[in-house]
Amino acid sequence: MRLMRYLFTTVLTLLFISCSKGCSYNESQSSHVEQTTASNQVEDKISPDDYELSTDGLTLIKWKNPNTKVLDMNRDTYLSKIRFIGDWAFWDCNGLTSINIPNSVTSIGEWAFMQCSSLTSINIPNSVTRIKHYAFSNCSSLTSIDIPNSVTSIEQGAFSDCNSLTNTYIPSSVTSIGKEAFASCSHLTDINIPSSVTSIESQAFMQCLRLKSINIPSSVTSIGKEVFAFCSSLTSINIPNSVRSIGRAAFYDCGSLTNVTMPSSVTSIDKFAFARCINLASVVFRGNNPPKIPSLDSYVFNETPSNLKLIIPKGAKNRYIKAGYPEDKIIEQ
């Protein structure tokens, strides 16, 4: 999956390079003196040659100085007034370690900070309402991120492959977590999903290898395909009564998962949902009516322990057998 994403972004990169760039914003030169931050980092001087703006001065098209390490955009006359950070604007700025975004900015573009491998700190102001696709993907030194409460959705791949990210704050303004939003954040240990979230899209937390537990709020109605696949440290999961469907391979290869409780609200479980959960000991079904499952060739519990127990309510055994659940694993309780 990650290889496909990298191939995809590589193709887009080549297309981007081949396209003609927008016009520079030619105004009188701006300048500022070196400043020392609270963390004793020296902010780099800003020259008009360091960046390219759109003709109206509202969009940062490209940051052009590869040697910049600490950047406070508020200290430049024109950067402090921009509204948009454009697609690819800081792409592959490997030396950039810290950036302060002005509170005039409302949108951070697609791939804007992708592969800024030295970026450890970023201030996202409350003016920002959109963090677009793959905006911070592959920022491998970023350890934490505070998403402002002005943001309503975390879009596709926004923080994917941020390998050093250990925690993140998701505000109650967020209603949806997009596809691959935190995929392959291999050091992410826990995350709090607020009750405002109604949608968690496919692969959102796929390959978060150190994620141990997650609480899904009762506002969520479905768990998309491969959302928690390959989360090998995940030991517990709370599925609320609001959830109606569990997508394909949603918990595939979650090798540390031992017990799952399935609320009566769940009406369908797609193929391979819990396949290769090699330590899964029991699944407790609360409903008298079994969730619909696919045929045995794509069985929900493929490659799970032979002594897996499917615990169901008393009197419901025949219904579960007719629905395709294996009789030898069913225990009425």
Regions found by a protein language model. Give the residues of each.
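Consensus positions within tandem repeat domains that build extended binding/scaffold surfaces
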Residues: 86-89, 109-112, 132-137, 155-160, ...
